[in-house]
Amino acid sequence: FQIGERGGQDLRGYMVDALVKAVFLPDSAAKPWASAGCLYFSGDDPDSTDDEGWNPLWARYPQFGLSDLLIYTYDADGAGRWSNLAAPYLSAGFVPHRDARLSLMVSHLLAPENDGPGSGDQRGWYAGASYQVVLARAPLAQRDELKGHLQAELLEPGDYYARDRHTGYFLRWELCYSF
C-alpha cells in the first residue's frame, strides 16, 4: 500500500504480485515447471481528486515477466511508470540441458481504470519467450564464462490504446563474457 499526501493531493495506491508455481519431476534433468499468477497495479480514477495510481518508485523494473516491450506502452504516463495494470498470466519453462533454460509466458492485460487514449479497458495480449545458455566455461581462465541470451516478445494491443495501434515486437540477443 502507498498512503500519503503530495501537494495537497491524497495518495492511495496499491499493488499485488501473486504467484503459484509447480515444479514437475524435480529430480529430472529438465526440471519442468509451470506457474500462474497475477500482477496488479492500481490506477488513478479520473473521476476522483485523489491519486489512486501505484507509484512505480516502489516497484522493480521491468517487474512483469520477461518484458522489455511492455514498459514502453506506458509512455503517456511517463516512461517506465508502471500503473493501472491487471495482468493474470501463465508461464512455463524447463532446462533443455545442463547449461540452458527456456521460459515462456502469456498474459491478458487489462486496465483497472479506463483512462487511456482508446475507448476501453483491454490493454491487450502479451507473449514472451526467453532462452539463456552458457556457451563456454573457462575458455581462457578457470572462472571465465561465455553466456548467451535470446529474448522474443509480442504485444497485441487492445482497445485501451488509440485506434491506430499496431502489434509490437521485440527481439534481443546478447553475448556476455565474464572473467
Describe the residue ranges of each PLM region:
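Membrane-embedded beta-strand positions of outer-membrane beta-barrel proteins
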Residues: 34-36, 90-92, 104-106, 148-152, ...
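Extracellular/periplasmic loop regions
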Residues: 2-94
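Residues that define the transmembrane beta-barrel architecture of outer-membrane proteins
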Residues: 10-16, 84-88, 121-127, 165-171
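Transmembrane beta-strands of outer-membrane beta-barrel pores
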Residues: 1-5, 24, 38-44, 106-112, ...
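Surface-exposed extracellular loop regions of Gram-negative outer-membrane beta-barrel proteins
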Residues: 1-19, 131-139, 143-152
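Predominantly the C-terminal beta-signal and adjacent terminal strand-loop region
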Residues: 136-179
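Outer-membrane beta-barrel architecture
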Residues: 17-22, 91-93, 128-134, 174-176
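Repeated loop/turn-to-beta-strand initiation elements of outer-membrane beta-barrel proteins
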Residues: 27-34, 98-102, 136-150
